[in-house]
Amino acid sequence: MLQRDYFIRIIEEFTAALAQFLEKKEGQQRQRYLEDLYRQYVGDYSLLRNFTVEEAMLYARDQWKEEERIDRLEMLAELYLVEGKGLQNPLRDMLLNKAFSLFDYVDAHSHAFSLSRQAKMAEINKLLCR
């Protein structure tokens, strides 16, 4: 129980840090902050960003505890989404597709229904003109 409370606190910190990132202006400082978010909450930026969805899933299985895996995959999807929205194609679509795939996986395997997650998936579909 204590470990779950600790991880819930990590999720809350991640949400606050992501909101702070979204307030930053474009530029190198914003990019460094994004890379720090990856490093602090999910892992190495250059590694995770360049993974396919399948590779990210294998990484999750190997690196994260089972009870944290779904939440960390959702964090990774959030990072893909916010980064993808700030880029041009083809990187934009690549990251948005990865974000959608991870959100879809989390939605199917999570024990909690999330309207926020559903809204993000709808937003991605709209951005990708699906």
Short names for language-model regions:
Residues 89-130:
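Amphipathic alpha-helical binding modules
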